[in-house]
């Protein structure tokens, strides 16, 4: 794990976690989860991870997601005003702790921005899609540059 300096006395407005692609020699070889506040990161899926849990040729390390991603979600729901989770996808839903952390976060009354794997039929993603208090925006090559502005406007108008 690696990270950047984090001052717990300063309460950040936004927190959460993101998934970052690992590229080696021009090839995608894995994914890491990154805490948006601390910068801590851990490899959660990699072609070189020897694991009985494999998805799309990647070995999974669920403890990486539990230690960084789940902790980032929990800290954000306690300390911040806005939660971001990028992304809830095939790798992350393999962690029961992650699924529970997301469900718990969604029970809180706070603006939450999630990216969802479009094709996944995992119960967590299905439940999120069915929520009355959720607004689903599809990212396309045409709208991807404008979506941050649209999301900012929606959060401002709603909260």
Question: What positions do the PLM features span?
Answer:
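Short linear motifs at secondary-structure transitions and domain/linker junctions
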Residues: 1-11, 57-60, 87-91, 111-115
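Phosphate-binding/switch loop-helix module in NTP-utilizing enzymes
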Residues: 50-103
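Residue-level preference for the first positions of well-ordered beta-strands
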Residues: 15, 81-82, 111-113
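Glycine-rich loops and low-complexity Gly/Arg-rich segments
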Residues: 39-44, 56-60, 108-111, 137-140
């Amino acid at each position: 794990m690696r990270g950047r300096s984090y001052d717990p006395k300063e309460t950040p407005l936004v927190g959460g976690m993101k998934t970052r692609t690992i590229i080696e020699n021009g090839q995608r070889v894995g994914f890491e989860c990154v805490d948006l506040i601390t910068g801590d990161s851990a490899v959660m899926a990699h072609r070189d991870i020897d694991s009985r849990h494999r998805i799309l040729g990647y070995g999974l390390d669920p403890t990486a997601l539990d230690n960084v991603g789940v902790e980032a979600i929990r800290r954000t729901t306690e300390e911040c005003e806005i939660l971001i989770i990028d992304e809830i996808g095939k790798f992350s839903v393999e962690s029961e702790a992650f699924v529970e952390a997301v469900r718990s976060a969604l029970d809180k009354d706070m603006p939450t921005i999630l990216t969802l794997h479009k094709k996944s039929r995992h119960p967590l993603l299905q439940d999120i899609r069915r929520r009355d208090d959720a607004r689903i925006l599809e990212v396309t090559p045409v709208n991807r540059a404008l979506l941050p502005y649209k999301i900012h406007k929606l959060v401002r108008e709603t909260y």
